[in-house]
Every structure is written in structure tokens, then in C-alpha cells.
């Protein structure tokens, strides 16, 4: 008799737990949810002095509810800390223990200026999870992402290498490839070119030969191809990348087909396969992004604009479903790219509106501090290009100097310095010009930079030689630029070099060679279209036709020159009247809030007299550390432009939960 009677209290208590949990879930899932009553039901569980495991689980559930449905972060933290203190030493309680650690780390990141507490929590959890492959790998990914966000790339890379080894020991091939590709992404941001190639080759062979599930294989292929495309773009290899980009576009179409299974179906059956880099809808936007980057670098501004508008439309659709932070990252990078397109085409007024739109996205994003911090240097660079193209050289110089001081990205720094060199050239500051060219030359003899940026460097040297009337030296530099540009189909760099070479030949009285240079320059400029090269080229053509006494063609060239000039002057007038023009005075802190006409993307570009053209740097890389997503931009300018910035960092940094960037 004593047996049944002693068991009854325990059975009765279990029934109470179950009833209260059921009620809590009922209130949580009601329409609308009744979170207050849900929390009251969970709190009532503690009155029964439950066993340790029940108490820890209930504290975890309270923390989850408070984080998801309320702003009571302090109470959420208290419950999660209690759950961790109870569960840390309990055996066979991994889900509660490590879920709590993961959530506490997230909460520390949200509420504390430093990530140290989050890292310490995850390091302890990683140490305790070594016998649970799923949680060990999940926590390694989370910790590596925090290190990557803090630009501690070596630490992130080491953690990802540990994850790859753990996955291999567990026979989890799919997960191992995710770790390898995530590590390749980090190494790409570090510009460890040889290591990136080795990892990509290793991962590519495994994808081809050791992934039996066709859907997982295609998904990994998209991740692999995104990194491969970004790798080539970061090196300015626009022509070399074309086959990989085409493959990527075909793969994403396969994944987005109506008959393709849902991500839950593909990744939901095996715990060690429940990891994805990005869901397919976000991958779709990312492929648009790298396509935009490629179009910009290749000098196809119309294509870049078209794909940007499609990508932005897709982002808005996804935001209506769920406003994920990565969508804000993608949007900022796309706006940075489209700004470059507008300036090349002579529509600076729309460019400054889009810079303001990018600022608004940074300020409105939930991860405001990190997003603005990550894109501040790019925004200063873009504003510098805008100020340069509207002849506000003092403002442009200060913007580029701020960019150089804020960024740790070598290519962005080089890009800003090249534009500074052009400003010093235009304003006849020979000492400053020599100093910056010497510094750029010294630094880049020891490092391998993007083909596009190095071509831009030779172009600036050619422009400098031209202004010194050192025409032989100018030809030497410009031929080097043309060799690099032609090798990789860098059309804008080609057109700028050709028009400057034409001017060189015109200056030494060789009208035949001048015509041979300016004709293809104008054809390319029309195809891009680049109004600055068209303005310059039409002036050269007018002089050439006057010299050959061809009055009709001289008249046509003059009419074209007037048309381009008037378009740019009209646009200049709109720029200085725009409230967003005030952004040229932003040099520190948060960017000022300006008001103006709302941004509507499809706008016919207009066109500056005697323009200073932006140079256009190289890359667009999109990276991500394992299961999340991060972001980047290129740029440049001169009395004719050559480079461009917009994501002077690869979209490789745009995909890791929130980390990275590039353009």
C-alpha cells in the first residue's frame, strides 16, 4: 500500500507540469498570442520545486519567450543564466545546456558593447560539447562568426578548421564541406589567395565525388560557385570568371525551380545535415548581387542597373515575409553598386539620393551599430566620388582621407588613395601627389592587388605624366593599363585609357593615331554608357575634324559635346539644390539625416562639364561564415574616370550572419 501512495505525489506533480506546459503553449499560440498568461503558467511551475532538469528547461523556455515576444531583456537574461547555472554540470542534458549557451551568447551581443562575454560563454560550451557532434559544430560556427564580425579572421579560421575535422571524424561529409567553404570565405577576406585556392579545390572535389544527395550537392555547388566568382572578381578577373558565373546562374535557377524540394525537406532528416549557409531565397538575391558586381566591373552599367532593380524588388518581397538582418546588408551593397553606375552615367543627383538611401538602411537596421560601422568607410568613399564629380574637391579630399583612416581593407584604401591622387593632380598639388603615388607604389610592389585596381594605378600614373607633358612616359603607362584591361575585358578602364592615349597623340600632333584611339574609346563609352569619356572624346573628335578640315563631322562632334556638357551642367544644378548634398559635410560620427525626393529606382540617367571621373576598383565578394550571412564595394575618379567602388570588399563578407563585405 505504501508503494502506490508514495508514487501518487510524483505522478500528480508530473500531471501538473504537463498541464501547465500545455496551457502555456496554448496561450503562446493563440491568435493573438497571450504572452502574459503564457509566462504566468511557466512561472507557476516553479512553485512545485521541480527537479533540476525541469527547472532548467523551464528557465530556458522563459528566456526564449521573453526574448521573442517582449523587450524585457534583463528578465530574459536572469532566466537564461539560471538555466545555464543549473544545466552546466548535468549529464545527458545537452539540448537545454547548449541551447541556453547559444541564446545567452546572442543576448550578450545584443546588450553589451564588447563581444567578450559572448565569446567566453561559447568557448565554455564548445569545450563541454565535444562528445556531441551536432552541438559542437553548431557552437563552433556561432563562435567563428562572432570572431569574423570582430575582424579576428585568424581565430575564425582556426575554429572552422576544428569544425571540419570534427565533421570528418563523425563521417558528416556535407557538414565538412560547409566548414571548408566557410573557411575559404574567411581566407578570401584575409586575401590569402593560395590557401583559398587549395580549400576551394579540395571542397570542389568532395562535392563532385562524395555528396550522394543531389539536392544537397546542388546547394553546396551554389556556395562553392559564389566563392569562386567572388575570388575571381576580387582579383579583377572579369573575363576569367564568366564560365563560373554562368554555372552559378544556372545552378540558382535549378534551386529556385517550382519542383525543387523545400529546405526543410532537404536538410531536415539527419541532425548533422541541419545546417545551411543561406536559405535559397537569400541565395537568389546573392547571385543577383555578384552578377551586378560583375556587370559593373565589366562596364555594363545598364545590366548592373537592371539586375540591381530586380534584386531590390526581391529583397522587399522577402522583408514582407520576415525582415532578416542579412537583407539590409544585401540592400546596402546593392545601393553602393548602383551609386557607382549612376555616377559613371552622369546622374549624380540620383547617386546622392541613393547614398542617402544606403545611409537610411544602415541607421534603420536592427544591427545598426555594426552595419553602419562596417559600411562607413564605403559611404565616405562614395560621397568622396560624388563630391569629386561635382567639383567639390576640398570635400572630396576629406571624405577620401576619412575612408583611408577608417578602413582596414587594402583595396578600398588603394582605391581612395588613387582618387586622392587625381584630386591632387587636378588641384596642382605636386608634392602631395608624388607622396601618395610613391606610397601606393611601395605598398603594392609587395602585395598582389586586383587587376582592375592595378590597371587604375597605371592609368593615374599615365594621367600624371600627360599633365607633365611627358608624353612618352604617359604612353608607356597607358599601354600597360590597356594590356591589363584588355586581358580581362575591363571595358571602362579600356575606354578611359584609349581616350587619354588619344589626347596624348593629339598633343604631339599625331592625328592619325589619335583618331585610331578615340574611335574605339567612343564606341565603348557609348556601350557602357560613360558620359565622361563621351564628353572628353567628343572634344578630341571636334579638334581632329577641325584639323582635317572636315566641317560636317566637326559640327557633329561639337553638337555632341554640347549635349553631353549641358546634361552634366543640368545635373550639377540639381545636385547642389538637393538636401542630400549636405552629406558632403559628414566627416565623423553618424551621418546627418537629410530629406529629399523619395527614391524611385527606374530613373533615366542624366549627366559634368570637365568631369572628374570615378575610377572603378574591382571586387565584389560575398562571404559567410557558416550558416549565416555578411558583406562589400569598389570606386575611383579623374578628369575622366576609371575605377569604381561600391562594395569595396567582396560580397564575401556579406553573408555570415552578419559579417564581412566587399565590392
From Swiss-Prot:
GO annotation (BP), single: maintenance of mitotic sister chromatid cohesion
UniProt keyword annotation of Repeat present: yes
Family annotation (InterPro entries): MAU2, TPR-like_helical_dom_sf
Compartments (UniProt record): Nucleus, Nucleoplasm
GO cellular component, one term: nucleoplasm
Residues in TPR repeats: 455-488, 495-528
Keywords: Cell cycle, Cell division, Chromosome partition, Mitosis, Nucleus, Repeat, TPR repeat
A Pfam family recorded for this sequence: Cohesin_load
Superkingdom field: Eukaryota
Subunit structure: Interacts with Nipped-B to form the cohesin loading complex.
Protein role: Required for association of the cohesin complex with chromatin during interphase. Plays a role in sister chromatid cohesion and normal progression through prometaphase.
Family according to the record: Belongs to the SCC4/mau-2 family.
Protein name as catalogued: MAU2 chromatid cohesion factor homolog
